[in-house]
Amino acid sequence: MQITRDKWSKNFSEWFDWVLREGEFYDYGRYPVKGMGVWMPYGFKLRQNIISIIRNLLDSTGHEEVLFPLLIPEDLLRRESTHIKGFEEEVFWVTKGGSEDLDVKLALRPTSEVAITTMENLWLKSYKQLPKKYYQIVSVFRYETKATRPMIRLREITTFKEAHTVHETYDDAQRQVEEAIEIYKKIFNNLAIPYVLSERPEWDRFAGALHTYAFDTIMPDGKVMQIGTVHHLGQNFSRALDFKIQKKDGSLDYPHQTSYGISDRAIASVIAIHGDDHGPILPPSVAPIKVVVVPIPAKNEEGTQQVMKYSIEICEMLNKNNITCVTDQDTEKTPGEKFYIWEIKGVPIRLEIGPRELASSTVFIKRRDNLKSYTVKKEEVVNKVKEVLNEIQEDLRKRAWESLKSRIEYANDIEKAKNILENNSGIVDVPWCGSKECGLKIEELTNARVLGYPIEDRKVNDKCVICKMNAKTVLRVAKTY
C-alpha cells in the first residue's frame, strides 16, 4: 500500500461521503428528513471521545453543565431584536399541539442565549455569584436552505456545545473570552486540528454580539470551515431581557455576558483533515479503537487457532494497559479485506500476527499514518505501542499545521487574490484599510467570504487593495462551507 491523497484532495466531497458510509461513522441522506443524519455506533464512539475532551476542559475551568428545554416561545426569542434578525429565516417553528393551534409559536432551539439569560435572571442576583459559567451539549436546529452536507451543513446539529457566562464588568467578560480561546486551542490541539484565529468583521458577527472570534480550518479541497466561535455579548442580551445584578457598590446594572460554541464540524474536521485515499487517520487521542489485531491464518486449522489465541492474548495485554484494542476474528474475510475495513475506520495501529510471529513470540506493528512497520518482542509490545501512538498523534498534528500554513498566501492585488482562490483555494491575506465598504467589496470581487482579521497586531506596509489608502491590517479571504 502506498500513501496517495488524490481522491482525498481532488474529490473530497465524494471521499467524505464514502468514508462516513463505509467506515460506519454516520448515515446521511437516507433518513427521511433533509439535513438530518444518524450517528452509527462507531461514529458515536468517536463523537463521545471528542465530547469527553471538551467536557473535561470545561469542567476543569469552573464551567457547570446544564440542560435546557428544546422549545423557546416566539415572544421570548424576539426580545433581542438584532439576535432574532440574524436567525429568523433559519428557525423551525412548532405551531400545533396535537390538532390544536398553539397560542404562541414555539421555536426549535437555534441557539440558547435568550433562553439561558431568561433563567439566569431568576438565578443570579448579586456580583457575589459571579462570574458564572454554564454549558450544555445539545441538538440545535437551523432551517438551512443551501445544499446540506453531512456534519458540515445540517438542519439538526446534534453535537452543539454552547457555553454561556455572566460577569459583573466588561473587562471580566473579556477575560472570559480570552479563557475560552485558550480552552478551544487546547481542544483543537488534542484533536490535532490546525486553525487560524480571527476576529470577524462587524458585518459578520454573531447576531447580538459586540465581538466574535472564530477558529477556521482548511479542508482537503481548499475550502475553509468554521470550527468554533467565541462571542463577547456585552450587555445586549441582559438589557433586552431586563436582567440586572447588584454590583459591589450597591447599584443595580445589567451584567456582561459571553457565549462560545463548537459543533459537529469539529468532528468532521477530525475525520477529514488527517486522511488519505484509503480513508481517515484518526488521532489516537480520540480514536474509538487505537489498535486492531489482524491474525494471519496458518496453512492448517490447528496453526490458525494457535495464531488466533496468541492474537487475542496480545490484544488483552493492550486493553489491560488502557489501549483500546480489538482482534478481528472474522474467519470468512481475507487479511487484505480486513486491512481495507480497518483503514477506512481510521484505526491508528494495525498488528499483524501470523505463524512467524507466533513461533518467535513477536508482533508486527504497522502505522496507519506513514506505513512504517516494526517487529517487537511480545514483552515489548505494550511500551512500543504507547510510543508509536504518541508519535502518530504528534506527527498528525505537525503535518496538519504544515499543510495549513502552506495554504495561506498574501496578495496585495485583488486580481491576484482572486486567481489564488480560484486555482488553489486556501486562505488569502489582503491588505485592508478597516472600512466595511472595502471589506464588502473584497468579498464581491473575489467571489469569496471574508473570515476576519488577526486578533494580534499585524502591521502591513501596503495599501488597501480597494481604496489604496494605507492598510491597517490584513483581511483574510477564503472559499468557505
From Swiss-Prot:
Keyword ATP-binding: yes
TM region(s), chain numbering: none
GO biological process: prolyl-tRNA aminoacylation
GO cellular component: aminoacyl-tRNA synthetase multienzyme complex; cytoplasm
Domain of life according to the entry: Archaea
Keyword vocabulary terms for this entry: Aminoacyl-tRNA synthetase, ATP-binding, Cytoplasm, Ligase, Nucleotide-binding, Protein biosynthesis
Domain notes: Consists of three domains: the N-terminal catalytic domain, the anticodon-binding domain and the C-terminal extension.
Name assigned to this protein: Proline--tRNA ligase
Lineage: Archaea, Thermoproteota, Thermoprotei, Sulfolobales, Sulfolobaceae
Recorded name of the encoding gene: proS
